[in-house]
């Protein structure tokens, strides 16, 4: 039986001072979260949705008695997509604000620096947006927990999704940093395993936050692959799609976007989002049709006048992971919480369904959804439909890979 099916059997604007600006101090007895996301520039929507989700989650939790009868508070700051800014924020959170948990960031590149900071300071970092698989793989340490499906999981799910389709000649157009490369490498490796007949005909890695994609669009048109794996996200995905539309690229080549099912892409594209593009998103507000998700979407829309993006869904889930982990451990003390989380898998319910924290690599186990874009008159933008679910057991680390992660960590730790 699937773990994701069997786990169903496991049984004012702000309430109080639950959500704080950087000029307000935490109260002494609260459970404290220091969160960092990109909240400015063309990727700023990621931080905005994260902030709103944290507000909503904390209000719910505190209205229900908090965590261990303690109020929960958070500060949310802007990393500006800069490592030094993020590290300074983390240092302030730990040394001055005395937070119990760090949360974020958006960029995997910044997360690589923050995870080392968390290890050195023995402070738990909850990853809710950064997705490079190395964060719970080659860079694993016990103080990091990832509550969203990482690049490896999404890439493997994409390989399963595409393996049943007739395409043979593949190439990649992805951002030139850790996430883009790991996303492609994992997709390619799993697809070649499932479909030995596929052929890789090109790999293109434009600079992150590129403004002009003409060179890369022309190369795809010249090579004319059957399909393109394209892990561009946010404003980069919007710019690429917008610039490619006049060329008819999406009628000539099937594009597969592992994160373009995000509202950060679909809403600004509006009617211009091409139909028939394969997309995934770690959470999409129309699925699942559960009471929890319906309530979350309704409350979020009522409060913020917009639908929750995947950053909202995943960050909301991250806050509730902290609640579940603290309640199991009966403490916020990092080492005791880690020990409790590693005794057995920890399951908690979220708007996107049940999530399970793997006690070995601290990665979430969950299904991944894929769909195909089509314009929706009700919402005024394209949404994915005809969802296909790839089960979590198929896309997470194997028993051998999990063992290798801990063995490698033990070597580094000793």
Could you say what each language-model-derived stretch is?
Residues 2-13:
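Bacterial N-terminal signal peptides that target proteins for export
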Residues 93-106, 126-128, 171-174, 224-234, ...:
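Periplasmic-binding protein-like
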Residues 11-22:
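Bacterial N-terminal signal peptides
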Residues 302-312, 323-394, 412:
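Segments of small-molecule ligand-sensing domains
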Residues 88, 133-134, 141-246, 286-295:
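Extracellular/periplasmic Venus flytrap/periplasmic-binding protein
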Residues 34-55, 77-84, 106-107, 173-181, ...:
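Extracytoplasmic "Venus flytrap"
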Residues 45-52, 60, 64-137, 147, ...:
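Beta-alpha junction/loop-to-helix N-cap segments that form part of ligand/metal-binding clefts
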Residues 23-27:
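Sec/Tat signal peptide C-region and signal peptidase I cleavage site
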């Amino acid at each position: 039986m699937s773990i994701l099916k069997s786990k169903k059997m496991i049984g004012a604007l702000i309430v109080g001072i639950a959500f704080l600006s950087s000029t307000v101090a935490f109260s002494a007895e609260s459970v404290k979260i220091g969160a960092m996301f990109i909240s400015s520039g063309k990727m700023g929507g990621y931080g905005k949705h994260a902030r709103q989700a944290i507000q909503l989650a904390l209000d719910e939790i505190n209205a229900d008695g908090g965590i261990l009868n303690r109020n929960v508070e958070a500060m949310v700051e802007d990393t500006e997509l800069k490592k030094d800014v993020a590290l300074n924020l983390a240092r302030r959170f730990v040394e001055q604000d005395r937070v119990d948990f760090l949360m974020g960031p958006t960029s995997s590149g910044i997360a690589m620096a923050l995870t080392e900071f968390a290890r050195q300071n023995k402070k738990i970092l909850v990853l809710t947006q950064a997705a490079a698989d190395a964060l719970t793989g080659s860079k694993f340490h016990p103080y990091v927990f990832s509550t969203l499906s990482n690049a490896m999981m999404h890439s493997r799910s994409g390989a399963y999704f595409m393996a049943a389709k007739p395409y043979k000649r593949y190439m990649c157009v992805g951002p030139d940093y850790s996430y883009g490369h790991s996303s492609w490498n994992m997709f390619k490796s799993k697809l070649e395993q499932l479909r030995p007949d596929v052929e890789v005909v090109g790999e293109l890695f434009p600079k992150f936050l590129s403004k002009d994609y003409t060179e890369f669009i022309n190369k795809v048109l010249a090579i004319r692959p059957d399909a393109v794996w394209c892990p561009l996200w946010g404003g980069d995905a919007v710019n690429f799609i917008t610039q490619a539309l006049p060329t008819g690229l999406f009628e000539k080549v099937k594009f597969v976007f592992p994160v373009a099912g995000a509202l950060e892409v679909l809403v600004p594209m509006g009617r211009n989002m091409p139909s028939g593009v394969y997309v995934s998103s770690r959470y999409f507000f129309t699925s699942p049709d559960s009471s929890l998700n319906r309530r979350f979407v309704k409350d979020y829309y009522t409060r913020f006048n917009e639908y929750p993006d995947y950053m909202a869904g995943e960050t909301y889930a991250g806050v509730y992971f902290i609640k579940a982990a603290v309640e199991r451990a009966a403490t916020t003390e990092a080492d005791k919480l880690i020990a409790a989380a590693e005794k057995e898998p920890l399951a908690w319910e979220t708007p996107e369904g049940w999530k399970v924290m793997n006690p070995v690599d601290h990665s979430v186990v969950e299904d991944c959804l894929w769909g195909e874009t089509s314009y929706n008159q009700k919402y005024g933008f394209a949404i994915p439909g005809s969802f296909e679910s790839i089960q979590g057991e198929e896309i997470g680390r194997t028993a051998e890979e999990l063992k290798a992660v801990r063995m490698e960590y033990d070597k580094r730790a000793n």
